[in-house]
């Protein structure tokens, strides 16, 4: 990756991450752009594989107490070197007492920090829901460097 090359050449390593939020209505091209971005990041050496792994809440959250972190970590492990695209990311935290969703979010926040040199996570969803989700989650918000807004065609 770029960071590894910088390190090999004795250059300082930046704490830059490429995690981002795609915000917009259905059909505005969020998934298509994420696929293109995954390939571009591979070509740039930011990630090693360049595949887009598309997931939702059910892929990250378990039905059993204590199993969500395991499930989320296993999915992130499989996503190393790729872009992990979490559609309707706000659904991870549906209610204030949603301990399963909170466990998934806490696990993702840790992995976004620890694996940022070979993993890109894109959180996607509708504008109002994503704004609410990110504003109640300072840890998640601090790891997102780019907010890309997708407008319906003709707007």
Locate predicted features.
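Walker A/P-loop
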Residues: 12-50, 74-78, 144
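Short glycine-rich substrate-engagement loop in P-loop NTPases that contacts/grips substrate
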Residues: 48-79
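Flexible beta-alpha connector loops of hexameric P-loop NTPases
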Residues: 57-68, 91-102, 148-149
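Conserved nucleotide-binding/hydrolysis micro-motifs of P-loop NTPases
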Residues: 59-61, 90-92, 126-131, 152-155
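Structural recognition of the conserved hydrophobic beta-strand(s) that form the central parallel beta-sheet
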Residues: 85-87, 106-107, 119-126
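A short helix-turn-beta junction within AAA+ P-loop NTPase domains corresponding to the substrate/partner-engaging
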Residues: 135-152
